[in-house]
């Protein structure tokens, strides 16, 4: 709790994560131990118990350890303990069972967008989902877009804030995590057409919702409040469910993050310069962008080899 108290100026998502870890510790016998009594083997045994007995996933345990390791490091720095019991490699103790969110193929993307466009009910979400697939925006960046952020003359999207809704149902505007998150994302003519339709069909509420000084959000829900990530996650979930009831060849799970990952993967496969792609994606670290280049399949490798051979 002292560690959390000293962490000022952190994002509300981070604070929520800290509270979750504190609540978990309060319920556990491990959490009642004195810090100078916690051994390396105790820390490992507890994390194994979280996975094998409590059924927690790797990513959840990774987040818990991500709070406890720096908290114990603070105790080391304060000379309260000699060594950090959480200073070990997590994957050496807990099985990584997390499912990576793969990009979908170009054919799957085409099939899904065609299905959405032609569906009587879901066609209303076509423009928004098309934009997600063809800009690579984070869903919180997309939800935060206002009419003023779409610069049609320059054919670009201004990205300098994110919209999120807290667990207390409060709407908040946040700045991107890093400077790299502030950028202009170029638009194709098709993306610009989607934005034009969205703005033309946008509801006109009696009172424009305002969040931290921002107004003119592109998508509003039935309560005339800006749509948030959860809305789009649910729309995509229901779309894929309906698609899979109709077609024999099943569509994998598609989330807004899968749309972003698919865009990134498609750009990498098309031979886009990694530094250019890093800028468009808003990645602070080039290694995150380069990881996408590792998602190539044999067909991609074969096509690339033939292309170079012909050059």
What do these predicted regions represent?
Residues 90-91, 145-203, 210:
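Conserved tyrosine-mediated DNA breakage-rejoining catalytic core shared by Y-recombinases
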Residues 2-80, 98, 120-123, 225-231, ...:
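N-terminal core-binding DNA-recognition domain of tyrosine site-specific recombinases/integrases
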